[in-house]
Amino acid sequence: MAQRISLTRYLVEQQRVDGLIPSQLRLLLEVVARACKHISHAVNKGALGGVLGSASSENVQGEIQKKLDIIANEVLIEANEWGGHLAAMASEEMDSIYVVPNRYPQGEYLLLFDPLDGSSNIDVNVSIGTIFSVLKKPEGHPGVTTEDFLQAGSSQVAAGYCIYGPQTTLVLTVGDGVAMFTLDREQGSFVLVEENVKIPADTREFAINMSNMRHWDAPVKRYIDECLAGTEGPREKDFNMRWIASMVADVHRILTRGGIFLYPWDKREPNKPGKLRLMYEANPMSWLIEQAGGAATNGKERILDIQPKQLHERVSVILGSKNEVERVTRYHSGI
């Protein structure tokens, strides 16, 4: 029987053998994984734990918060604030950054997260997840400010997500490919199930919210029309559509078997470049996709090259199988 490799062992080997990650980053990722285990337990309890339904509050995005949104956010903060690995955190659910209190030692990393992506699906028992991104705090000044977080996605030192579905699976990159770990509840630890995840360059699956078709820009509509035309159209092959309304679930499917995910700009809010959050969702997911051989753009430029101007910046997202993403990007260029 093949030896089971735990997340801890995997990270130690990444540090010791490959020299890819410093010890403080390794310890930080282990803490994030433990927090995800706690969130997984809360999600699994559902109605039995009294965690379903909406809270009486809105987040900075103006969205009604679910009870589990708040619980997951608190779990991540409480797990990470005292370890000495972080200088500050930023969350989709908080207006401003959370600086590690003076009573705890401060580290050299910044942690960003969407504590519970796809939370509109909580009450109907569809897969949801936690997305996270790790940056290095810029040197040269004491303390930490919001500006320290405003780094392009190409500056990430680690990124991943934990999906709470039929299995709880942690997906991670530290810049050397993508690895997947499934939570063994009997053992109480994440166990490596796949290394060097690769996305096929071509696909027959696309994920987009078709109900918004009338609001799309011409390049996106052209691409989807060609997919829908099937074997009789210019693509000369049939496509299937998938849409879960949970980015974690849609991206996990793409990492597992290929596909393209589109959450484009639309005409309802022309002054907004998109809906998904650049720092909490687009950057970490785009790095994972690229590390698996895929591509990620906003239709015009690589997601990881975008220089953020604000903490809660939004962006259009097209990611997945490389040849399909490049095709949509060409259409935006008028080709």
From Swiss-Prot:
Assembly and oligomerization: Homotetramer.
Tree of life domain: Bacteria
Cofactor binding remark: Binds 2 magnesium ions per subunit.
HAMAP family, per the entry: FBPase_class1
Record Pfam families: FBPase, FBPase_C
Name under which the protein is recorded: Fructose-1,6-bisphosphatase class 1
One GO process term, biological-process aspect: fructose 1,6-bisphosphate metabolic process
